[in-house]
Amino acid sequence: MEEWFLYLIRCPDNRLYTGITTDVARRFAQHQRGKGAKALRGKGELTLVFSAPAGSRSEALRAEYRIKQLTKRQKEQLVAGELAFEAMKSAPQTP
């Protein structure tokens, strides 16, 4: 089984983009070249601020969904290490 990772990228306007991949370095390089998500194209210098192993693809997708539901403050707490990523992986899914 291939290991998937969840990552957060900070844009120059301080927004946080959340994504999943099997290779964080490759995917971040794609984003920097403008070959990744449309949401990041033309946004200027990007900074990878968080990445963590998320298990299988389905587990990574669930964690990505949960993180995208967080407030900006909660995402900043995750980046700062004040909110445990493991809690995002194991939290019950919202209907």
From Swiss-Prot:
Q: Which InterPro entries match?
A: GIY-YIG_endonuc (IPR000305), GIY-YIG_endonuc_sf (IPR035901), UPF0213_domain (IPR050190), UPF0213_GIY-YIG_endonuc (IPR022992)
Disulfide pairs here are none
SMART domains xref list: GIYc
Q: Which Pfam families match?
A: GIY-YIG
Boundaries of each GIY-YIG domain copy? 2-77
CDD domains xrefs:
GIY-YIG_UPF0213 (cd10456)
What domain of life is recorded for the organism? Bacteria
What family does the database annotate? Answer: Belongs to the UPF0213 family.
**In its UniProt entry, what is this protein called?**
UPF0213 protein ESA_03545
